[in-house]
């Protein structure tokens, strides 16, 4: 006893307080676990688990109400695949505690407003859907939900707002109807008919210029590539025609109907959609990806038709599972294969279709590409007897439809397939694709196989690739990735610069300094120099050729050796590549040396940009140069260009961030300054203001470079496409060659992959390049891009 009293006297009973805090934290963690895990595998039925959990939460409401409210709002937003489980739980709590139900509805409306304000429109859709399902659980009165949807659809009447804003509010309304349409129509049929009429009127008049840019395939056979709102409208129309009967949504609240129907309902507070502002960023439109139908799995359960609302519900739930668990591939795969009602549908077909729908989504997949590869590998391990066969069937279908597949999606298909093969000993029935051997090498199928084998080599080695494919495929196999050194054999003795190359080789091996290399290069004659030009500073292609060829040849052992060589002789590179022609020639020579090793080319270009040996505009000009025309449609070329653009964008963002931080620091300094005359503060302000001025200049310079890079790229695209179109018109041949398809879709790809940056320069692009006089084929791409956020 005395020990306890001594403790109480000395620290005021703190251990007791800590114990109370610890107990409270444990209880909160326990509540979080119970709420998050409800609906997962359990010995008891879902209904009894929900009833038990409602009892536990009700008992804890007096002490943990705010925590419970916060948790339920969070799961409504983040676990949409368990939507009806949580709405039932809220319904049971509302039946037991009416005030809590009201507070929950208010909290959800607050969260919805915050999500819309923060441009979290995808989460806002789930919140709207959750609120609508609360009508089924007798938490929210149907008339107030109808009034909210009426306000949503009234956005279609707004003037001077982007179409994507109107689209989102229509989508939020339509996508909730599979859950609540029946209940709303029973209670308020006249009002619902009016909302439907307004929706139909809007859908008929909205523009769909953007659709070609977002389609995975240009052909509509065997499956139409429908715009997402058109497809959803058709599904809802069919559902309405079927008297709102759907057979796939889990509705646990039906088991509690006798309890829930006695509960008092809440009216939603009047909800006015927040007005459009300059900062509003709405989701882009989409095109619905279709790959399978009921004929693809004749023996299993029937796959719902493309305009069946069950197809929408299943796909939506699978997308939600991936969204919730994409960071944990094992959990994600397990959740997908244990999907409720899996025995009623061909689940593996749905899973594979949904994963490819995300992987091929334009402009970008929801998650990083490699996630889909690892998820499919995990699914193959979980379902070894069935899923690999469906995946092989899907791969075959994609291969068969390569002729009309969007080039960006072909790139992703190449990257996925090569990575997938590397995890399964590169086993594939290549003979089944031997039809590609008799086709034009530039047509999509042989091109696809060549690119896949090249990517496989990056994940393996050259001889392994030769061993895995039949000898008949040798023409499509990648070249041996060795260095080509033009001064290396006896026949090169007569080449200009040969003797200097030998001297350089000796100097490099002797660990020569930059000055010693300059001394050796000093006497290299300049084929471009006039006899009366004594300056010696003009661009000297031979000097660059001898130096770059010899250095890269001696450093060819590995990436690391090459990087070390660039670093050691950085000063020489910078001097030789001082002019724009010099930078371009360094890239040309590097390409000649490593022509057979695309990966080495990519990493060397990356390193040269980072170390400022070449700039981004030089890389863009090199890619569109005549020297690269033979390789212009190869994947590695476009990977280099996109990597170059990303580097430029990161550079601009980095300086902008530094400027913002400096401005914030100055603002904080002003705030802290006392009323006294503090001269040291003035001095600090002066230093910061100078720094801000310098950073402002750097930002403007970087943005100018960024704009110039895009101008160079688009200008070169316009030039080569115009040349092709004129040539075809002159010769009387078809414009639609494999080269043209690839090139015009690469132009689309630039717009899509960098849309957020390019939108800053739209006025400049429209005034300087994409003018009304431009050929309609090229101008159409720009117009499609403009329509994406119109």
Curated annotation (Swiss-Prot):
Short motif (Nuclear localization signal): ranges: 3-20
Post-translational modification: Dephosphorylated at Thr-21 by the PNUTS-PP1 complex during RNA polymerase II transcription pause-release.
The keyword Heme is assigned to this record: no
Effect of residue 7 to A: Reduced phosphorylation by RPS6KB1. Abolishes phosphorylation by RPS6KB1
Covalent link (Glycyl lysine isopeptide (Lys-Gly) (interchain with G-Cter in SUMO2)) residue numbers: 684
Main location: nucleus
Record-linked Gene3D superfamilies: 1.25.40.180
Biological processes, Gene Ontology terms: 7-methylguanosine mRNA capping; alternative mRNA splicing, via spliceosome; cap-dependent translational initiation; defense response to virus; histone mRNA metabolic process; miRNA-mediated post-transcriptional gene silencing; mRNA 3'-end processing; mRNA export from nucleus
Residues annotated with N6-acetyllysine modification: 204, 698
Phosphoserine carried by residues: 7, 22, 201
Region of interest (Disordered), ranges: 1-26
Modified residues (Phosphothreonine): 21
Domain of life: Eukaryota
UniProt feature coiled coil, ranges: 643-713
CC terms in the record's Gene Ontology section: cytoplasm; cytosol; mitochondrion; nuclear cap binding complex; nucleoplasm; nucleus; ribonucleoprotein complex; RNA cap binding complex
Keywords: Acetylation, Coiled coil, Cytoplasm, Isopeptide bond, mRNA capping, mRNA processing, mRNA splicing, mRNA transport, Nonsense-mediated mRNA decay, Nucleus, Phosphoprotein, RNA-mediated gene silencing, Translation regulation, Transport, Ubl conjugation
Molecular function terms from GO: molecular adaptor activity; mRNA binding; RNA 7-methylguanosine cap binding; RNA binding; RNA cap binding
Localisation: Nucleus; Cytoplasm
Span of domain MIF4G: 28-240
The family this protein is said to belong to: Belongs to the NCBP1 family.
Role of this protein: Component of the cap-binding complex (CBC), which binds cotranscriptionally to the 5'-cap of pre-mRNAs and is involved in various processes such as pre-mRNA splicing, translation regulation, nonsense-mediated mRNA decay, RNA-mediated gene silencing (RNAi) by microRNAs (miRNAs) and mRNA export. The CBC complex is involved in mRNA export from the nucleus via its interaction with ALYREF/THOC4/ALY, leading to the recruitment of the mRNA export machinery to the 5'-end of mRNA and to mRNA export in a 5' to 3' direction through the nuclear pore.
Quaternary organization: Component of the nuclear cap-binding complex (CBC), a heterodimer composed of NCBP1/CBP80 and NCBP2/CBP20 that interacts with m7GpppG-capped RNA. Found in a U snRNA export complex containing PHAX/RNUXA, NCBP1/CBP80, NCBP2/CBP20, RAN, XPO1 and m7G-capped RNA. Identified in a IGF2BP1-dependent mRNP granule complex containing untranslated mRNAs. Interacts with PHAX/RNUXA, SRRT/ARS2, EIF4G2, IGF2BP1, HNRNPF, HNRNPH1, KIAA0427/CTIF, PARN, DROSHA, UPF1 and ALYREF/THOC4.
Protein name: Nuclear cap-binding protein subunit 1
Lineage: Eukaryota, Metazoa, Chordata, Craniata, Vertebrata
